[in-house]
Amino acid sequence: MAKLTINPGIDTYISDLTKLYDESEEICKRSAYMGAKIVADRCRAEIGSLPVETEKQKRENSEPSSGLTGEQRRGLLSGLGISHFRKDGSFINVKIGISGRNAKNQPNIAIIRSLESGTSFRTRNPVITRATSAARGAAEQAIKKQMDEEIKKRIH
């Protein structure tokens, strides 16, 4: 008859894996937040780099605007945020978005949409698309690094 002897280290390894499985959702949430933070920071930088125009400049210029007023830019920066986590099946989702209104009671989402798509009064300037594309690699690396750190903390 076959005999199986298990090294005492295997029990520790199995308990570490069980603990890791139990805490996997928390690890994924922390890692996803780190990636979202990098993308949100890049979006903030892109919005902050947009040219600022005064109301007078906008009225005098017959060309479509390429920038924002100071109030619009401040409204976008204050309305930019990261949503709460949402679990969708086996996925953990987090969204970065813009909400609220600026000092002139203009919806921030309408302003950013007019920038992304362009309108008759504003030239297309896809700041969010540009920011997310530029931050994708850094966000993926941050997620991987955070996940590795969290796993090492729990296993060792």
Regions found by a protein language model. Name each.
Residues 1-95, 99-156:
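Short, Lys/Arg-rich flexible segments
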